[in-house]
Structure formats: structure tokens, C-alpha cells
Amino acid sequence: MASKSDKQVTVEVNNNGRSRSKSRARSQSRGRGRSVKITVNSNNKGRRQNGRNKYQSNQRVRKIVNKQLRKQGVTGPKPAICQTATATLGTIGSNTTGATEIEACILLNPVLVKDATGSTQFGPVQALGAQYSMWKLKYLNVRLTSMVGASAVDGTVVRISLNPTSTPSSTSWSGLGARKHLDVTVGKNAVFKLKPSDLGGPRDGWWLTNTNDNASDTLGPSIEIHTLGQTMSSYQNTQFTGGLFLVGLSSAWCFTGYAANPNLVNLVKSTDKSVDVTFEGSAGTPLIMNVPEHSHFARMAVEHSSLSTTLSRAGGESSSDTVWQVLNTAVSAAELVTPPPFNWLVKGGWWFVKLIAGRARTGARRFYVYPSYQDALSNKPALCTGGVSTYTRQSNPVRTTLQFTQMNQPSLGRGATPATLGRSIPEPGDQFKVIMTVGALVQPNRSDTQNWLFKTVTPPTGHDAARVGWNTQHYLTIQGFLLIDSLEWLTPNLQESQEPPLIPELGVYIGIHKKALVYFMQQYVNPHTNNKHQVSSIFLIKPTENFSVTNYMSYFFRESQSDQNVANLKIRPQTWQQTVNFQRGKWYLVTNTAIRNGPPPSGWVWDNIELTNESIYYADQVLAHFINPPPQNSKIYFEVHTTMPQSRARSIGLEEDQTDNWQEPDEDLQTSTEESDYETDSLEDESDDEDSNTCRELVINTLVNQGISRERATYIGMSAYPNVEWGSGEQSTSQHIQEISSDDVGAGAHYSCVCERKQQSLNQGSRGHAE
């Protein structure tokens, strides 16, 4: 207490857990607690103090008291290091329903404060959190920076509130007002300020850093941001769907107690913007969340979760030791049907999950749902008291947006192979796994009829067929076509990847004009009969300009046999002349299917054969998607190549009647009959083969000296001199080298040019020896 007469300040701190009798002997009370009494004489014996001296006196008293409290150990350990940082955590979206919607839930543990798109990237706060065992906050400022003008939108108010326990709860807008909160008007910047008294931990103000420890000691408080009222555009009088605020944290994190846990910096935080979610459960069983196994969240959970050998408390199935926080920020949160009694948990917008070992028969990944982080650590899933009624059961999953955060890492030390930070960029030639989202139907296709395909390789008079290939003798006529809305590129080990470069050797041609680029190719060869094989090819193309294709079209149908219980898949004999429009910048999946006679082919097959009426086709990996139009927004998965399989380039030749040149041959490349006869005879002479080898080596060495890679130069040389000599009527080797050196087009164009000239020469000579 403070005495007014002598200006003495007395501070008494008693940290004994219980009261003690005054009659108890002093020896019996030792070690049971300590009472700290500090008396400070702040009286100035001189003249009366002015305002400045009073402030200095108060500062002196405060320093003395703090020093004595630290000596007695009642204020916790001294900070070893403090880090001031500003973190930008994402955006606050608009309200789409008019009800209370959660937009963000920010956990303040330093290893969890990450951007929702940051993956495993980390900053100085996360790095320090992985090196020290305890943390606390000196202060915290939550800054909302407006992304729209005050007059641009209306109808919505934003509320920032402090959740001191970081536990999901069923809270209404009025309940949020009972917390410490700040209401923000859209269009104005705001700062939500918190003091140390709002952020103190259970250990003299400190929190534990390791998230594997008790939840009440590690998570710290959390910041929740909600919106109320539908967001409308003032200018258009329509619903506004953009972002309202940019969220940032400004704070000073203090750390003490060095204890390195390197893997804490690798905790993942990301967003899955389109995922189908369902919940299941019955009386007495755990609540389970299902997501597709190809979704971004499922892949990340499988990659970063470590499965334990212990069994679940109620389900009997093994679950992971890794806990994930899931935040549903989409409008569909209220549409998710959940078994009782945890409807409030899902509609509240965020919960915790752990991956269940194995996958469901439907191909989905399953997760146990937990109402709190402590329950997840203790492996106590939410138990249902009943199932979903028939009237409310969903026929289709709800598509929503999930923000997910990896909460813990069972193994905290650094393994033999450190985790790779950031996103890897694929090298050319890699194989990829691609998940494609189907777009709208391309006319003349309709949802209630079979898929139209280009049937013939010979178009109507005055029109050209669309061909995809790499030169005049190696191409396929486009048959099937499908609009693709979006693509997700994955590496062979299911890591996210950037879009690979185009395949420079390939293109889509209408006549002699290149209309589209090719980004991947894949071919499937399936045995048809003992001496036949069905070859189906797919290509992903992107038009560089708008173009139309007019050709004879038909569709597949099931033909029933009277003596058999099977229905054969055949192409309709009747054809209709139709026009299909391809739009610039859109993705299209195009296909070609052919029945090949003979032994099993090796390498890539360029058989430009039309769909025949008598042939029976199989619904293979490609045709299964082109018999009937797939639903819009459905997913299609393929494993593809993003470069030409170079070892297969000339493995399969075409018959004369299957070849259709895109360009007229140059007059300089025409050879006389005598020259062709001479070339045919020379193929039987071994000395001429040696000359051909010499010319080939000359071309290769010249290209290498001019900067082209050895592999590419060899590829061009082998194609220009396939063990035959050029006719005397062709251009000389030096002329070809000069053209390759001076031309501005790429190596793929040079290669095609050389191959076309050589092939035209061979066609005029002895074609049988060319191959």
C-alpha cells in the first residue's frame, strides 16, 4: 500500500498456495511458499515536486519493484530474444448469405502464424519458435486494411474478437460481442489492439512453443474475424464477391529457453479452393469427414501425416498422430449436413481432424473430427448420438473452400533428408499427373445425347481437317474434343507443380496453318484380338487464335447381338456435316482412336485411320470419357508426357495412302528419275552407307559447334541421314547447315524441315528402302 504521510510505497506479494495458521512454528513453514514485501521510500525531502519529478519518481518506484519481483522469481524467466514482426495473413472475403460467417481464425503460436498460401515457407518468428521452448507476446495489433472504398459496397459489418482458449464454440453475433472485440465498417482501416494482460500464458505469462504438448499450454489465444450482413455492390446493386480487407499482425514475440525443434518450421498451411466434403456417422460412432483423395487437402494430409499404431477410442481404426485445423470460409458451411450432436461445430466454421489409415471404397480420404485440439491430441473424436435422417441426407457432396493448418509434427528433429521449402519447378521431359475439371459442352454436343466425334480423315470439299502432329508424315486427325476449365499439375509423387512448357515439336494444323499449341500427349495400346490392337491417343491443346473445324461427324452406340448377351461398341455409319468452334486461350482435350492390324506396336504409333463402321471398339482409358458427355465440373485424371518421346519418333511408318502432306514440296527438292534410280541402287553399296555416316557426323558436329545440344544435334542428324544418301538433286549438306544457322525458328522447326525434305526425296526415289 502507499502511505500519504511519508510517501512510502509497500508492495506485498504472497505466492503461497494456501493460508497458514499464525501459531504454526516458523520451521514448519519453510519451503512452502514465500511472501515478498517491498517498501520503497519515494519521499522527496526538498521542495514540492513538479510534474516532471513526479513522473521520474513513479518510474523509479516501478523499476525498483520490478527488480525485486524478478529477484524473487515471481515474474517468470527473462526473455532471451524478442522479435518484432509484421505478418500478412490473407484477405477477408465478402458475406454471401447475410448470416454470421467466419472469415478467419488466427492462432498466435509463432510456429502457426503463416500465410494461407505460404505452404512450408517461414520467417524469423517461425524460425525462433523452432529454437526456443517458450514464447509470449508484448503486444498485438491486428490491422485491417480496406480493399474497397467506403461507397463501393454496403450491407456488411466486420467483427474482430479475441478467443482466449483457441477452442471452437457455438457463438452467435451477440455472443461475439461478449468477448473483447472491435467492430469495423467496410471501407475504413482499423486496428484491434491487445495488451499483455489479454495475451498472458499459464506459466507466469509464458506459453510453450512445442505444439505436441498440452493444448492449454501451447496454442495461446486466437483471433477470430466474422462478418454479418450480405455484401452488396453499391454501383451495380448486385452481390459483391470480392475481398473486403487485408489482414496483418504487428507484434513483438519474446522467446526463452533454448530447445531446438527444427521440424516445427515445416508445418504446412494452405487453401483448397474447391473440395467436395461430406460427413458421416451413426449413434455411438465417431464423426468422420470425407474428401476426395485427389483433392489438394487430401494429398497434403497424406504426405505430411504420420500414422500411429494405436487404435481410435471408439472406431477401432488407426489414425494419424498429425492434427489439422480446418477452417471452412465458404458459403456452403451452413449447407453441410452433419450427424447430431455436432452440427454446431461444422456450422461454426472450424474444427480439428486427423487422417484415418487407408481409403474408403469410394476413393475418398477419411478424417476423424475433433471438437478441440486437446481432444485431438488425446485421440478422443466427436461421438455421434444419431445418424442423418433420410430427408436431410445429401445426394451430392457440398463443394466448399477449406483453409487447413498442420498443427503439430510428431518428429521434431531434422531427418536424413530435410524438407524442401517452396514449390519445385518441373524440368522438361518429366512425366506428370494431371487432374482436369470438365468445362461446358462444346456445340453440337448436348447433355442428353452421345458425344459427337469427327469420323473421317477426309473432310468435305473446301474444308480442312484438324490434325495434331509433328511433321507431314506423323500426325493424327482430331476425333474427340472436350473443353477443360482448369488443370492441376502434379509430379509423379503427387507434389504440386507449375504448368510445364509447351511441346515445341507438336502443333494443331488446319491446312498449312498452325492453330494451337500442344502441352501434353499420352497413348494407350490395348489388345483387341490376337492380331489387332486398339490405339487411343490424347493431347492437351490451347488455341492461339479462334478457328473452326468442319468435318463429317458421328457418335458411338451399343449394338446388341441376337445370339449374345453383350452389346458391342461401334461407330454410327451415318455421318452429319458439322462445324465445331475452338476459342483462343481455352484448354481442350482432343483424342484419336484407331484399330491397328498386326503385331503389338512398339513406340508411339502415328496411324491416321478413320473410325470404321465394321470395327468393334473398347471403352478404354480414353473412349470411356467420350461415349457420353461427362458432367460439367467433373474431374478427369491422366498420367501424361510433356515432351515428345524421342526414341519413338520414327519407329512406325505410314503407308502411302495414309500420308497427306500439309505443304506443297519445293521445286528445288524435286529429283529426276535417273537420280532416284541412282539413289536406290546406291543403298545396296556399303561404301555409300559410309558416306552417309560421314555426312551425318558432319551435320551433328556443325550443329554442336553452333550451340545446339549434342542430344538434339544427334536427333536431327539421324533424321536427316537415316542410313541413306541424299540424291544429287537435293540441296547440299552445307546448304542445310547454312539454313539451320540463319533461320530464326526453333530447333524443332529445323528438324521438321530436314525430315520433310528427306522424306519427299525418298518418296520420289525408292520408298521401300527409306524405312
Swiss-Prot record:
Residues 394-423 are annotated as: Core attachment. Residues 19-35 have a biased composition (Basic residues). Residues 1-70 are annotated as: Basic. Residues 649-771 are annotated as: Acidic. The record marks 313-314, 393-394, 423-424, 657-658 as: Cleavage. It comes from the Viruses. Residues 71-263 are annotated as: Inner core. It holds the Pfam family Astro_capsid_N. The keyword Oxidoreductase does not apply. Residues 424-648 are annotated as: P2 globular domain. Residues 1-59, 653-694 are annotated as: Disordered. One of its GO terms (cellular component) is host extracellular space. Keywords: Capsid protein, Clathrin-mediated endocytosis of virus by host, T=3 icosahedral capsid protein, Viral penetration into host cytoplasm, Virion, Virus endocytosis by host, Virus entry into host cell. One of its GO terms (biological process) is clathrin-dependent endocytosis of virus by host cell. Residues 654-692 have a biased composition (Acidic residues). Belongs to the astroviridae capsid polyprotein family. This is Capsid polyprotein VP90. It comes from Human astrovirus-4 (HAstV-4).
